[in-house]
């Protein structure tokens, strides 16, 4: 088990996003190339390479404007792996081309939870999710990696506490894809869940890719800052997100044009998120997003969990 975990762990070091990306690309280049070749083979067989490139063409200028950290990291990965930048942009938009090809998809996908203590040292206790995908299209998971992003210590004259350095973080992902879920050094946890269905809108060539959003969210110092940013940027496809730092949690469902969220404690901007419904005297608030129901949620009253689930 230790050997398996060591093989999955990659450390990306550097004082800038570009340097960290270059370090990551060099360390994981064989896995990145293997996954890229696999995905090209899959989408070529589906006759979808041209459509994939259309999605890349739409995403690239949006990344320049809205996700500069992630784009710089991606460029560094390309350099470190000795690959073309376009290949890494393709991997960054893999989820969007996969959704494009699936058409109307419903049910299944990931499940997650968070626990927030309300009394006796209140604060978020845990946030997490599973990754519920078809292993067959991801090399049976053997390429998946845990990435530790590390910046050098701040200098003595760094009065900001960060000095423009990237926040340290640990994240799970497929090699070459910016992020799937993670936790940064400010204690911000980022998770996401599928909510797309036949009635949902998509903007796959006019919005930021999901895995790019996830990586950029991990550059923010708080759940509040991350949620406000996520609401402000163009989003390619519908998703649900759970964001939590040590004192505040957000549960979000959004499409390219619509936004619904709850938060505890609620933000001053009530348009960003409404308060969660709490039981008087409760010591814990538990939120979850479930795509695999084992009970009839319409008939179990208010105890089924979060209303966004």
Segments and roles (model prediction):
Residues 1-81, 117-309:
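C-terminal, well-structured catalytic/ligand-binding subdomain of enzymes
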Residues 79, 83-128:
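Gly/Pro-rich turn-and-neighbor structural signature
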């Amino acid at each position: 088990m230790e050997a398996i975990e060591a093989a999955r762990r990659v450390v990306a070091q550097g004082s800038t996003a570009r340097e960290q990306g270059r370090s990551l690309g060099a360390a994981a280049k064989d896995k990145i190339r293997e996954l890229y070749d696999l995905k090209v083979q899959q989408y070529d067989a589906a006759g979808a390479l041209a459509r994939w490139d259309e999605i890349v063409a739409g995403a690239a200028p949006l990344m320049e404007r809205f996700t500069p950290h992630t784009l710089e990291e991606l460029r560094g990965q390309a350099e470190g792996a000795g690959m073309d930048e376009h290949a890494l942009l393709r991997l960054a938009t893999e989820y969007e081309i996969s959704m494009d090809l699936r058409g109307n998809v419903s049910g299944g996908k990931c499940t997650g939870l968070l626990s927030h203590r309300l009394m006796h040292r209140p604060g978020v206790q845990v946030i997490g999710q599973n990754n519920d995908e078809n292993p067959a299209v991801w090399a049976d998971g053997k390429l998946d990696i845990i990435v530790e992003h590390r910046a050098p210590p701040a200098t003595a004259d760094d009065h900001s506490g960060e000095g423009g350095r990237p926040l340290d973080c640990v994240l799970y992902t497929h090699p070459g894809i910016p992020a799937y879920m993670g936790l940064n050094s400010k204690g911000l946890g980022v998770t996401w869940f599928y909510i797309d269905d036949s009635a949902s809108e998509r903007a796959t060539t006019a919005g930021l890719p999901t895995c790019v959003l996830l990586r950029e969210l991990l550059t923010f110092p708080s759940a509040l800052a991350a949620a406000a940013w996520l609401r402000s940027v163009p989003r390619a496809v519908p998703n649900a997100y759970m964001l939590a730092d040590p004192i505040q949690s957000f549960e979000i469902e959004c499409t390219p044009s619509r936004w619904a969220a709850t938060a505890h404690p609620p933000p001053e901007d009530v348009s960003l998120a409404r308060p969660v419904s709490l039981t008087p005297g409760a010591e814990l608030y538990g939120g979850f997003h479930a795509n695999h129901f084992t009970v009839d949620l319409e008939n179990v009253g208010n105890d089924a969990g979060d209303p966004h689930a």
